[in-house]
Amino acid sequence: MRRRKESTLMQQITPFLWFDTQAEEAANYYVSIFPNSRILKIARYGEAGPGPRDSVMTVSFEINGQQFTALNGGPQFRFSEAISFVVNCETQAEIDALWGRLSAGGKEDRCGWLKDRYGLSWQLVPTVLPELLGDKDSARAQRAMQAMLQMRKLDIAALRRAHQGSG
């Protein structure tokens, strides 16, 4: 029996974000918000178009080791809540800082969701949330869930109090 040889190549998934004309602006915005982030490459349209010659076509950027590509593709497509980026946050200070920056000019929603100024959906999730919602004591888990459903920006202390039955 032959064994399949393990591949030494590692697949990497790169989210490809379609903007109308704001790819460079959005990429600069995102790298300004998250630590360990940078612009990697900017490609421009040539004579073949479809964008104006020398205008930005794509911007490759990195957020904390995860690569993204932003495209100036025109107005045909818009972002929706069907796709969102989850940011796992250790502390309330991290949630507060990211919430303030990402929601500025955008729209806050329930349960830690927001849309940024470009319409991209984000979820700012405390790393403790799966533990609270997955508690084997269903009453505790239910209290944490009910508290979360009432929140926009998630509040770790309030979630813990609800989980314990003291809030």
Walk through the language-model features, giving the residues of each:
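Core segments of cupin and vicinal oxygen chelate
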Residues: L17-G65
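Short N-terminal signal/transit or membrane-insertion segments
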Residues: M10-I13, V56
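Short secondary-structure boundary/hinge segments and terminal tails
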Residues: A48-P50, F79, D137
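Short, solvent-exposed loop/turn segments at the edges of secondary structure
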Residues: V56, S80-A82
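Short, well-ordered beta-strand elements within core beta-sheets of diverse protein domains
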Residues: P15-W18, S84-E90
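Vicinal oxygen chelate
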Residues: R2-Q11, L40, E62, T69-G73, ...
